Amino acid sequence: MSEEVDESVRRADRWSRVIGLFVALGVYFGALQLTGDIAISMLAAAVTAIGARIYVPYHASLRVAEGRGTNLAEIPMTGGYHYGAVGLALIVGPLVTVAVRMVETESILTLGAGGLAAAVTFVVVRAVLPQ
């Protein structure tokens, strides 16, 4: 990260690795218990961990006071997408996938429902959360 990024965002970025690991473990074992499907559990765990890894620094950047640093949206190297919306969409989508898998055995329908939930979450959250 750039020198202009607040230390709290840097700290959150470092901690997001650990948080992502524990989120992955929790989602994997929880989904495995609920569905009994190893593939869906692995997919849900990986994608949810990535979502947590993206969302945690975004959340920390929202708390950066004016003048103390630059938030993620203002740093040219971070890209032009909405970190909060992407992170939350990557968390909600897999959780919906697991929920649908509990009642539906067709994996294409299950993955489609999760993908649709992620897309809807992204669009809604992008409009609600600050950049």
Where are the regions that the model predicts?
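Generic alpha-helical transmembrane segments
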Residues: I40-L62, A117-T121
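Membrane-helix boundary connector in multi-pass membrane proteins
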Residues: I91-G112
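Transmembrane alpha-helical segments of multi-pass membrane proteins
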Residues: T48, A73-L90
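Hydrophobic alpha-helical transmembrane segments
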Residues: I38-L43, S107-A113
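Alpha-helical transmembrane segments and their immediate juxtamembrane interface regions
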Residues: A113-Q131
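Membrane-helix boundary elements
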Residues: I19-I50
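Hydrophobic, membrane-inserted alpha-helices
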Residues: F22-F29, L90-V98
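Haloarchaeal acidic low-complexity proteome signature biased toward cell-envelope/secretome components but also
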Residues: M1-L25, S61-Y81, A127-Q131
